[in-house]
């Protein structure tokens, strides 16, 4: 895991397996089925990295030989909240890692001015819960900012929110940092820039279309 000095709340997950799978996802000739499988796999690997600092306590358990105080996650409950629609493809990988997590959904689409328009919010109970927001792309950053806004408006502490994406553009990361400097943003790659259509370059195309086999 590494950081970029420009963005204090950005964490780049540079594990070799993550980078290997991301390269195959970028390939325009990768099939929908393979893209979907890779997204699930890479999200599981990223989930392992982002949860390494969860608080730990101990629980008394009895093994076949003795009783011991064994480590368990302390108190906090976990929720996975994909940003629709492409974020849905990331939730399965996280659920493979954390099968007991609750799942919410935040639905937004990008208007002509690239601003997010909310059409759905469904969340589990908020008390004492850590939220993992996920969306494959942070392009303009507006949808990511909006998703965090949804939680903060419901009094979820910033310390209980993290955002996970595959690729991000510096422009979007700056927007996210300006709005939510207290929320950690985890990505597999910080790419070069946004083009005139607000697509990430080099990016991986439209993640939703590639995930579901649709055309924009």
UniProtKB/Swiss-Prot annotation:
| Residues the record lists as binding 5-phospho-alpha-D-ribose 1-diphosphate | 85, 110, 135-143, 206
Reaction equation(s) it catalyzes: UMP + diphosphate = 5-phospho-alpha-D-ribose 1-diphosphate + uracil
Cofactor(s) of this protein = Mg(2+)
A Gene Ontology molecular function term of the record: GTP binding
Its EC top class is transferase
Cofactor: record remark = Binds 1 Mg(2+) ion per subunit. The magnesium is bound as Mg-PRPP.
Native species of this protein? Answer: Burkholderia multivorans (strain ATCC 17616 / 249)
Q: Might you give the EC number(s) for this enzyme?
A: 2.4.2.9
Q: Which protein family is it in?
A: Belongs to the UPRTase family.
> Under which pathway is this protein filed?
Pyrimidine metabolism; UMP biosynthesis via salvage pathway; UMP from uracil: step 1/1
| Annotated function | Catalyzes the conversion of uracil and 5-phospho-alpha-D-ribose 1-diphosphate (PRPP) to UMP and diphosphate.
Instruction: Note the CDD domains from the entry.
Output: PRTases_typeI
Q: What is this protein called?
A: Uracil phosphoribosyltransferase
State what inhibits or activates this protein: Allosterically activated by GTP.
Q: Any idea which UniProt keywords this protein has?
A: Allosteric enzyme, Glycosyltransferase, GTP-binding, Magnesium, Nucleotide-binding, Transferase
Binding-site residues for uracil, renumbered to this chain: 200, 205-207
Q: Which Gene Ontology biological process is one annotated for this entry?
A: uracil salvage
């Amino acid at each position: 895991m590494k950081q970029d000095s420009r963005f204090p709340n950005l964490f780049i997950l540079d594990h070799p397996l993550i980078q290997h799978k991301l390269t195959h996802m970028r390939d325009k000739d990768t099939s929908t089925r393979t893209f979907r499988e890779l997204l699930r796999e890479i999200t599981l690997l990223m989930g392992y990295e982002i949860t390494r600092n969860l608080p730990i306590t101990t629980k008394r358990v009895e093994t076949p030989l003795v009783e011991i105080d064994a480590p368990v996650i302390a108190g906090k409950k976990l929720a996975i909240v994909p940003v629709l629609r492409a974020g849905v493809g990331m939730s399965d990988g996280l659920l493979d890692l954390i099968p007991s997590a609750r799942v919410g959904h935040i639905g937004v689409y990008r208007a002509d001015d690239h601003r997010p328009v909310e059409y759905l919010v469904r969340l589990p109970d908020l008390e004492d819960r850590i939220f993992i927001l996920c969306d494959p792309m942070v392009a303009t950053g507006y949808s990511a900012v909006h998703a965090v806004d949804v939680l903060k408006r419901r009094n979820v502490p910033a310390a209980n929110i993290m955002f996970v994406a595959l690729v991000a553009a510096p422009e979007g990361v700056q927007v996210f940092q300006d709005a939510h400097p207290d929320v950690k943003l985890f990505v597999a790659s910080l790419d070069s820039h946004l083009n005139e259509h607000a697509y990430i370059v080099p990016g991986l195309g439209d993640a939703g279309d590639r995930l579901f086999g649709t055309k924009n």
